């Protein structure tokens, strides 16, 4: 087999084909230069054969990429690789080339034939002379235009049928092939990187991409995701995601205060930012994801005293419980989970710097406070001025503060409470300083994304900005953006992301209203993946209303997707090597501020197509797309027969009842068969009788 490599494509020809890369011939280069003067003279004129001589004339003569000989047939092969359009900064738009393409190809054919005639008599290399002689002795010419279509499809790029019609209308070969008995011309349209069978129709060779031509992770990111947009709470608008350092994207999320079991609000934070982390990595960004653990706090101290256990015992127990809940929900562990108690020296150092910078002051009671009015940009995240905050917010009355809005950075020690040594006496850090110190310790003065629940926007995240910028003076560029009060934005974080609240039957979830649910309580009734799916069906910034009816609906919807995968087992599907309309729309949805609502809708459209076609490749696509956001990765039967045990029947009991029903049917005991079916229905066990037997799933 003879192989010819043209850029990223490898053409493999049968052994009896005589093949050459014509544009690498020595004589081709000489012939091209000799034609250069003629072409400059003819610039902007139309030749006798109707070819626009202005096209590409600066290069002199031009030839096709590959010439092949087989018996009495001459193959002229021109390759147009539009695959990388949109991937490379200087890539020309396909629109700019379309109108000239027929003339360009016709000219290449003319010049190739003329070059072969010249080489037959004038080539210095004997093999070029011999090849030309054999080529010109052929009595049939076959011309193939091999077009690699763009990876990024849109209305800006024509379909292959559009190109075919254009070539059919304008690609006239007769003037150049009068001396050949037969002439055959056909454009071949492919996207070799995304087809499973490299053998093309009507041609004897195959085409593939060599391993050395694999796209980089950055190019793969651009294929699916030319621009991610994120809603920035700070600027109150969607912005293109342009990380400070694309090779080192950094995201910090405020984690849990570990004094109790995690509730549904925590579940939403876990799942939402797990989804965001997964997506950024899918786009090719090297991401470091940090989610902190607050393991010292007033509530922790009070709960430990109430339980009669040490703070260390309490926090260790609930950290383990938090991890168990997160694992159940399919949440990947953050790269780093710093604990507040392990970063006390960093907090003390930042407080010292704030005092030195005139942004904080020690009080007579041993506390240290942040002087809010010393930070002119305070209120930018919440959209409130200092006067608004003073008038509208409840502030702690404290005779040691200079201003009621000032907040505590360091708390003086109290009897029986844990304490650390500091320049201001023994004590412990305030809540807000923890995140500023830990994020600076891990990420430096600035980083890309800071996330958390909407309830943290004020005062916690507002205070973080004041602390971090007040200590370092470093801010991220926000394109000269301003708050609605007119001051310039000053933040150490480029993008602030906040997920919406969870409401229960339309009311805010709270212990006082008796509508407070822990993750563990919910998982007793619903499969963890159902809860994850329920969270992802809503946009992360929207309020999410929790109710049994909504969870039941999510369960039914996820069951439909898994039923599709059960009926049509998924084939292996590599998203980096396969692009279709579903993948494009899924990526476009996620690309638009992590639009899981639209992305999930694409999954259901795709499932509908799988149900109609039983296409294993499309089923593989469904599973692969679901996997991007942490869904549909389980064995379908395991999901359908698993779930919570609230129906009161174990899998073994269900299988036993089905076996007894089967025997009753064999004995024609229809009453017993119906009784067992009714019993299973009462327990929400759905039976499906088919030629292969009876299958079941939990309803």
Curated annotation (Swiss-Prot):
SUPFAM superfamilies: Anticodon-binding domain of a subclass of class I aminoacyl-tRNA synthetases (SSF47323), Nucleotidylyl transferase (SSF52374)
Motif ('HIGH' region): 256-266
Catalyzed reactions per annotation: tRNA(Cys) + L-cysteine + ATP = L-cysteinyl-tRNA(Cys) + AMP + diphosphate
Extent of motif 'KMSKS' region: 508-512
GO cellular component: cytosol
Residues engaged in binding Zn(2+): 254, 435, 460, 464
Binding positions for ATP per the UniProt entry: 511
Cofactor(s) needed for function: Zn(2+)
Keyword ATP-binding: yes
UniProt keyword annotations, A-Z: Aminoacyl-tRNA synthetase, ATP-binding, Cytoplasm, Ligase, Metal-binding, Nucleotide-binding, Protein biosynthesis, Zinc
Region of interest (Unknown), ranges: 1-226
Cellular compartments annotated: Cytoplasm
One Pfam family in the UniProt entry: tRNA-synt_1e
Signal peptide (from-to): none
Predominant localisation class: cytoplasm
E.C. designation(s): 6.1.1.16
UniProt xrefs under InterPro entries: Cys-tRNA-ligase, Cys-tRNA-synt_Ia_DALR, Cys-tRNA/MSH_ligase, CysS_C, Rossmann-like_a/b/a_fold, tRNA-synt_1_cat_dom, tRNAsynth_Ia_anticodon-bd
Gene3D superfamilies tied to this protein: Cysteine-tRNA ligase, C-terminal anti-codon recognition domain, HUPs
Quaternary structure, from the entry: Monomer.
Family (UniProt): Belongs to the class-I aminoacyl-tRNA synthetase family.
Name recorded for this polypeptide: Cysteine--tRNA ligase
Organism: Neisseria meningitidis serogroup A / serotype 4A (strain DSM 15465 / Z2491)
Gene for this chain: cysS
